């Protein structure tokens, strides 16, 4: 065992080296973990209560986040909702539109304050990532969305001829940029969201042939990776009015990973938060469902999920009351699984059965 004298000498040496490090690199360059003022990671709401639950509270601040999936699966919608939630809490948001496809009308419909949203439409991948770096270093921006990694075309590729080969250029660009900006992201508390597309690996016989663009660097640097898929198209008669999306938390460094959340995305309106509330209210027994009928405190208020959503949208006070009770249940540690929210197709089957019985 070390003697008391040895321990004093060690402590003296430790204090000396800590002072030297702080003097050289600045105060806060090294701290004891127990002395940290912010042990809990702050979060931004994703706009979907079910996804917030799966993420352990929401999208973490001061981290790199990747959202990937097939085309028209809801990637940009999810990012715009995160921007809207940031702006609601008084934050400043920026959108780096590398795809040159941002629709201001749709963004406004989702609740984004387009008058104060910072937008950049860069010509090259280098320019886009330099813009992100400057915004992060400013410590004035709370969230930056890059749409998308696949559209971050290196300058050499743009200036070259159409048939030229540029093997690994984009991957090297992403790797260099992430090495440069990740440290600043943590210090500034700015959340950087990269949207990404899927590609197919050639010659894969066993395992998943899908991969994301931009190399492997983003997979390592991202604290959260969300895999979003369209599982169902929502229809009224023959008219399509939205999609049912399923998000798998493929990676999470701030909460348990591999959770799954489901929610509706309505065309022109975005994520149906009321739908999320109904699903979680049913799980926490705030609302009961028998067959297709939904009831609250013993009284039926709607038949079928669509009518229940319509009822709550037209009765805002009732919806807020249900949401408050759901959040209270969740804060008290209610056993709710993000993997088992109500499935639209299952409910519709129940509704069809009930309607058939009524006709008989």
From Swiss-Prot:
- One Pfam family this sequence matches: RecA_C
For biological process, the GO terms are:
DNA recombination; DNA repair; SOS response
| UniProt GO molecular function | ATP binding; ATP hydrolysis activity; ATP-dependent DNA damage sensor activity; damaged DNA binding; single-stranded DNA binding
Q: Which SMART domains does this UniProt record tie to the protein?
A: AAA (SM00382)
* Keywords for the protein's UniProt record, in alphabetical order: ATP-binding, Cytoplasm, DNA damage, DNA recombination, DNA repair, DNA-binding, Nucleotide-binding, SOS response
- Residues the entry annotates as binding ATP: 69-76
Main location per UniProt?
cytoplasm
GO cellular component terms listed in the entry, alphabetical order: cytosol
Q: Where are the transmembrane segments?
A: none
Decide whether keyword DNA-binding is in the record.
yes
Q: Where in the cell is it found?
A: Cytoplasm
PANTHER family named in the record: MITOCHONDRIAL DNA REPAIR PROTEIN RECA HOMOLOG-RELATED, RECA
Output the HAMAP family linked to this UniProt entry.
Answer: RecA
Membership in a protein family: Belongs to the RecA family.
Q: What does this protein do?
A: Can catalyze the hydrolysis of ATP in the presence of single-stranded DNA, the ATP-dependent uptake of single-stranded DNA by duplex DNA, and the ATP-dependent hybridization of homologous single-stranded DNAs. It interacts with LexA causing its activation and leading to its autocatalytic cleavage.
Protein name listed in UniProt: Protein RecA
What organism is recorded for this protein?
Answer: Trichodesmium erythraeum (strain IMS101)
């Amino acid at each position: 065992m070390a003697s008391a004298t040895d321990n004093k000498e060690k402590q003296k040496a430790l204090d000396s080296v800590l002072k030297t490090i702080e003097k050289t690199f600045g105060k806060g360059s090294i701290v004891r973990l127990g002395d940290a003022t912010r042990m809990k990671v702050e979060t931004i709401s994703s706009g979907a209560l079910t996804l917030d639950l799966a993420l352990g509270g929401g999208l973490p601040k001061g981290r790199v986040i990747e959202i990937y999936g097939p085309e028209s699966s809801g990637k940009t919608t999810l990012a715009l909702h995160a921007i809207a939630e940031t702006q609601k809490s008084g934050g400043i948001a920026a959108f780096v539109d590398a795809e040159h496809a941002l629709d201001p009308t749709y963004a406004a419909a989702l609740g984004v304050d387009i008058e104060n949203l910072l937008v950049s439409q860069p010509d090259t991948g280098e320019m886009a990532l330099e813009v992100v770096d400057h915004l992060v270093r400013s410590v004035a921006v709370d969230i930056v969305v890059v749409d998308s990694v696949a559209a971050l075309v290196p300058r050499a590729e743009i200036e070259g001829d159409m048939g030229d080969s540029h093997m690994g250029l984009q991957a090297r660009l992403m790797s260099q940029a992430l090495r440069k900006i990740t440290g600043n992201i943590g210090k500034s508390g700015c959340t950087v969201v990269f949207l990404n597309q899927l590609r197919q690996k050639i010659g894969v016989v066993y395992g998943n042939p899908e991969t994301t663009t931009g190399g492997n660097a983003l997979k390592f640097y991202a604290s959260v990776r969300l895999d979003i898929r369209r599982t169902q198209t929502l229809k009224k008669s023959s008219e399509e009015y939205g999609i049912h999306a399923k998000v798998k938390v493929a990676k999470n460094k701030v909460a348990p990973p591999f959770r799954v959340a489901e929610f509706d995305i309505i065309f022109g309106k975005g994520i149906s938060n009321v739908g999320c509330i109904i699903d979680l209210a049913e799980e926490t027994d705030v609302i009961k469902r028998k067959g297709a009928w939904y009831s609250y405190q013993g009284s039926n208020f709607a038949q079928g999920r669509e009518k229940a959503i319509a009822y709550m949208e037209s009765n805002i006070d009732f919806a807020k009351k249900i949401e408050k009770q759901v959040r209270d249940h969740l804060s008290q540690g209610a056993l709710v699984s993000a993997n088992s929210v109500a499935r639209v197709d299952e409910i519709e089957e129940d509704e069809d059965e009930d309607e058939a019985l009524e006709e008989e």
